[in-house]
């Protein structure tokens, strides 16, 4: 793999994270309750941290052993609501987040098999694993919320 290709993929991933930050900032502006705004700020910070991690990959590269396995609770796969049409209840914020992270996970997973270059494939699998962690974060919040009888 050419170094330029690696850098372009990382830049693409950073741009997607910046889109996610804007997404959460936009939701903060729409949120009606302070606790919702605080949660959205935490999510924004999580995405900012992901940018930092991706930027470090510019220097360190990525190896197979860097890819962590994240169990898939599959909650978002069973939710059929269009996240764009949902209001900003706590439940719907979680659904929007789950669906966004699921989309990113699927994109990076698909890209990992489309490129024959092992280094590019490993990079996309690493990015997919990070998105899977974010998705699981939302699914855990959603699961906890549902268990409380909501």
Q: Could you say what each language-model-derived stretch is?
A:
Residues 1-150:
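Non-heme di-metal
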């Amino acid at each position: 793999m050419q170094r330029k290709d690696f850098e372009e993929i990382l830049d693409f991933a950073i741009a997607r994270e910046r889109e996610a930050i804007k997404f959460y900032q936009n939701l903060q502006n729409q949120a009606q309750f302070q606790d919702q705004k605080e949660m959205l700020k935490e999510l924004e910070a999580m995405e900012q941290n992901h940018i930092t991690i991706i930027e470090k990959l510019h220097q360190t590269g990525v190896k197979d052993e860097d890819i962590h396995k994240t169990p898939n609770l599959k909650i978002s796969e069973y939710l059929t609501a269009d996240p764009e049409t949902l209001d900003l209840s706590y439940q719907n914020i979680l659904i929007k987040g789950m669906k966004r992270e699921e989309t990113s996970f699927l994109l990076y997973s698909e890209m990992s098999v489309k490129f024959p270059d092992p280094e590019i494939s490993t990079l996309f699998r690493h990015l997919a694993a990070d998105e899977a962690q974010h998705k699981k974060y939302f699914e855990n919040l959603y699961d906890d919320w549902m268990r409380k009888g909501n």
